[in-house]
């Protein structure tokens, strides 16, 4: 099996890769964020990278976090697909537990992403956060220290979910991340006829969010981000309540 992630992807049957997928597989950046439309192939890439890390770096701990068990199960299935393509099916018990330990002592664990579920883990070599726009900010702050000693890699992937939360903060912030934006218009597997149908069926802000990677104001947001920003002034002194 080839050690190079790009060659490894081809070895598990992914020969027809998009340009952004090729760049991602060739990247060695320690922090990666994927802002992608639905059905762009981001979960498949995350699964390939998780499996590659576990196979080629013995003793690795690979954690896959998602907002709910359903999403964790979906991404774990991408790992299992790659493993099967190598002729090594994952035991049925691993599907139930959403975790597998390989012969080289590497472990892959897929977890519903809450702060409590990850407290027992440390020293992750690869940490993948799926649907990152919908995980609690507390989870992100809890997992970052897990990479301190291991020097591990973090990959966040999601479609946007409003101008709020850690995914939006990281995407728009100054911190150095390897950033990938993949809209439906750039995905060869999504046809224009389908997108036209979606434009007619969906509210415009939903379409922009789901297919154009746009961070939109959410429908349950009483005050828009612009309204909040406009209300903040550095000229106003903090209120002294006389406490302390």
Regions found by a protein language model. Give the residues of each.
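Conserved Walker A/P-loop ATP-binding site and its immediately adjacent core
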Residues: 59-81
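Catalytic acidic motif of RecA-like/P-loop NTPases
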Residues: 39, 130-134
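ATPase catalytic-site recognition across NTP-hydrolyzing enzymes
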Residues: 187-244
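ASCE P-loop NTPase helicase motor core
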Residues: 81-84, 89-90, 126, 134-202
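Walker A/P-loop
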Residues: 29-50
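Inter-Walker segment of RecA-like/P-loop motor cores
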Residues: 73-125
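Conserved H-loop
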Residues: 39, 67, 159-162
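Pre-P-loop entry segment of helicase/translocase ATPase cores
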Residues: 1-31, 239-242
